[in-house]
Amino acid sequence: MALEQALQAARQGELDVLRSLHAAGLLGPSLRDPLDALPVHHAARAGKLHCLRFLVEEAALPAAARARNGATPAHDASATGHLACLQWLLSQGGCRVQDKDNSGATVLHLAARFGHPEVVNWLLHHGGGDPTAATDMGALPIHYAAAKGDFPSLRLLVEHYPEGVNAQTKNGATPLYLACQEGHLEVTQYLVQECGADPHARAHDGMTPLHAAAQMGHSPVIVWLVSCTDVSLSEQDKDGATAMHFAASRGHTKVLSWLLLHGGEISADLWGGTPLHDAAENGELECCQILVVNGAELDVRDRDGYTAADLSDFNGHSHCTRYLRTVENLSVEHRVLSRDPSAELEAKQPDSGMSSPNTTVSVQPLNFDLSSPTSTLSNYDSCSSSHSSIKGQHPPCGLSSARAADIQSYMDMLNPELGLPRGTIGKPTPPPPPPSFPPPPPPPGTQLPPPPPGYPAPKPPVGPQAADIYMQTKNKLRHVETEALKKELSSCDGHDGLRRQDSSRKPRAFSKQPSTGDYYRQLGRCPGETLAARPGMAHSEEVRARQPARAGCPRLGPAARGSLEGPSAPPQAALLPGNHVPNGCAADPKASRELPPPPPPPPPPLPEAASSPPPAPPLPLESAGPGCGQRRSSSSTGSTKSFNMMSPTGDNSELLAEIKAGKSLKPTPQSKGLTTVFSGIGQPAFQPDSPLPSVSPALSPVRSPTPPAAGFQPLLNGSLVPVPPTTPAPGVQLDVEALIPTHDEQGRPIPEWKRQVMVRKMQLKMQEEEEQRRKEEEEEARLASMPAWRRDLLRKKLEEEREQKRKEEERQKQEELRREKEQSEKLRTLGYDESKLAPWQRQVILKKGDIAKY
C-alpha cells in the first residue's frame, strides 16, 4: 500500500502525501517497484522537480540509485525529456553525465533515442555530453537519432562529431542503414547529400541500406536511393540475396513491382533460392503471382533440391501451392492471367494496362505514385493476348480438351471468391421453367402462400460441390489461419518452426530474442499494471545483433515495432523501438472538440402518424461523461503503444508510438475520428413536402409521401428531425444552416460561431453518410451475383473488419475524452470559467500553461 502511494504521489507531484509517508517512516531505499525503480525514478521521469528534491534532500533517498537495468533517475529524466530534473540531478543530485546503464547507454544516448532535441542540445553545449560514447554494441547517439528520425538531434550530433556519419555498430550498421531501415527519407537524403554518408557501406552480413529498405518495404527510400545514388539493384549480401529477395520474402508487393519495373533481375542466391522460393516459403501469394508473370522459372531447385512449390507445400501454404502447381502445367503466355484472388475484396487502383516490365507491346506510360497505395498487381492484370481476362472467357479453340481443362481450372483457381463454380464459366444459366398455372394474386396485407405441392423441391448439393465449397472456404480463410499460426509460434522456435529441418538455406525472416528488461518501455506503467502486457524490446537488448534461426553470421533486423507479430513479423531492432512523439504538450484538440454543445431546444411536434420514437442515439462526444481513458494495445493494427510516459498532472499525458505499416503495403481502413453532434442513418436533410425537387428552408411536420426505409430518426441537439430521403432528388441544394436552431432550450440565442461549427459538423456528417451509402450499394451489387454461402462468408469478413474499426474509433474517442477532461481540470485549476471561453482562448491559456511548466 505504501509503495503504491509513494509511487503515485511521486508521479503526480503530491508533496503532502510524500511528507506524510516520510513522517510515518515509510520512505526508504527498499521501497522499489517491480523493476527496482525508486520513487526518485518516478519523480524524475514525471518531471516533478519539487518532489524529486524532497525525496533526495529530506527523505534521504539516493539520487544516483540504479534500477534493475542500471538506469539512474538522470536516465529517466533524459528519456522522458524533462530537462529541469536532468539539470538538477547532474548538478546537485550526484548523477554524472557519463553514467551508463547495463547496456552502456548514457543520458545522451537516451535523449537521442527518444527524440528530445532540447535535451540533446543542452547536453552537447553545457552538460558535457560525449557524442563519441558508444554502447556495449558500439552504437553512438547519432545511430539512435538516425533510427528515430529525429532530424534536429541528428544535425546537432553531426556538428559535434562529423566522423560519426559512417560509424558502424558491432554488427556493422551505419546511421544511414538505420535511417533506410526505418523509412526516414529526409534523414536519408541529409546523410547522403550533406554529410557524405556512404550508401554502399555494408553491415557485417553484407546487407546495404538498399537491402534494409527493401526488407521493410519503404518504397520512397528505395526510389530515392536508386534514382539519386549509384547503388545497384543487383547488389547481393553475403548469402547472395538481392533487394528483390528481401521484398519477396516479406510480402512487399509494391516494392517488388517497382524493382521489376526498373530493371531488377530474378536471380538465385548462394543457396540456390530465387525470390520466388522466398515468397512461396512465406506464403506470399501476391509476390508469387508477380514473379510468375515476370518470367520466374517454376522448376528451379535450390541446393536442397526443392522448388518454390515444394517449399510452399512444406510450410502449409496451400493457396500458394495450388497456384504454383497449376501454373506449372501452363505455357508462359498463359501465365499472364495471374491475378490476386483478394484484389476484388480491397480498394485497388484501376489497371494501368501494362502486363509486365518486359512486355514488348505498346503500352501507356505508368504513372507510379508513391503517395497512394496502388494495386500490387495493377501492372500485370492485362496483356495483349486475347485470353487475358479470367472472367467469361472460353478456352482457345485450337487447344486439346486436356489443355483447355487445365486453363479453365487455372482461371477458376485464380479467383475462387468471385468466380463461378467450375464448369459454369462461359455458360449462361438457364432460367427456371415457368409454372404451368398463373399464381393467384395474394390478398392485400398478407404474405405469399407457400408453393403448391407439385412445385419441384430444390436439390441438395452433391459431394463434389460440397468439397469445392470446403476448399474455397478454406482458401478464403488463409490469411486468418496464418495470423493464428504466427501467434502460436511467437513463443516457440521462431520462423523455422515450419521450415524443413534438413535445409541449409538461410530464411529471410528473423526470430526475436527474448527480452529480459522492460525498464525504459515501462516508464509510464502504473504499479499494478501487468508487465507482460507490453511486449517489445528493452533497451538493453535492442543493440544486439539478431541471429537467424539457422544462420551462423549475424543479420541486421529493422527497428522494433512495439509488438511481436510472430515469426514473419518485422524483425526486432538493431537499435531501438518504434517512433515516439516527444514528451510534452500534445497536439491541441480540434476546434470542434473544444466547445460544449448548446443546450438542446424543446422538441418540435412529431409528424402525424409517426411511429413510437426510436431509442436515443449515443450522446455526442463533447457531452459524454468522463471516462477512464485506459490505454490498451490495438490488435487490429498489429502494433502496441511503446514507451508510454504518463504525465501525472493530467496535461496531455501519453506518448503514443507511431503506428507503422506491417509486413504489407496494402491499404488499411483508417477511422476518420470525426466528432459530430448529429447522429442518424440518413443524410441530415429535411423531409420535403412533396416528391418534387424543391426544398423548404423550414422543418415540416407533414409526413413524407415516401417514408424512409430506416427505422431511426436523426437527433439534432436533442430534437427529433424528420428523416430525410436516402438520396435527395438531383439538383436539390440542401440548406444545412436552416436546420441549426438559433436559440437554445432556455430561449437564449446561440452564438454565431457555435452555429457555424454545428453547420460544418453536419456537412461532414452528410458527406460521410453519402459515402457510406454509396459503398454499401456497391457492396450489395457485388454480393448479389454470388452464391448465398459465399456471400455469407464475405459478409462475415466485412462485419469483422467493421467491428475492428468500431473498436479503434471507440478507443480514440476515449482518448480524446480523457484529454479534454484533463484540459478542463487545468482550466478550473487556473481559475477560468470554461463556459465563457472561446476555443482560441482555451488554446492560448493551455499553451501558456504548458510553456510556464518548463
UniProtKB/Swiss-Prot annotation:
Residues 428-463, 595-620 have a biased composition (Pro residues). Residues 651-668 form the WH2 domain. Gene3D superfamilies: Ankyrin repeat-containing domain (1.25.40.20). Keywords: Actin-binding, ANK repeat, Cell projection, Coiled coil, Cytoplasm, Cytoskeleton, Deafness, Disease variant, Hearing, Non-syndromic deafness, Phosphoprotein, Repeat, Retinitis pigmentosa, Usher syndrome. ANK repeats lie at residues 1-31, 35-64, 69-99, 103-133, 137-167, 171-201, 205-235, 239-268, 271-300. Changing residue 719 to R: In DFNB36; irregular microvillar organization. Residues 338-349, 487-505 have a biased composition (Basic and acidic residues). The modification Phosphoserine is found at residues 338, 342, 515, 647, 690, 696. Transmembrane segments: none annotated. Residues 352-377, 643-652, 667-678 have a biased composition (Polar residues). SMART domains: ANK, WH2. Multifunctional actin-bundling protein. Plays a major role in regulating the organization, dimension, dynamics and signaling capacities of the actin filament-rich microvilli in the mechanosensory and chemosensory cells. Required for the assembly and stabilization of the stereociliary parallel actin bundles. Plays a crucial role in the formation and maintenance of inner ear hair cell stereocilia. Involved in the elongation of actin in stereocilia. In extrastriolar hair cells, required for targeting MYO3B to stereocilia tips, and for regulation of stereocilia diameter and staircase formation. The WH2-domain binds actin monomer and mediates actin bundle assembly. Monomer. Binds F-actin in a Ca(2+)-resistant fashion. Interacts (via N-terminus) with BAIAP2 (via SH3-domain). Interacts with PFN2. Interacts with MYO3A (via C-terminus). Interacts with MYO3B (via C-terminus). This is Espin.
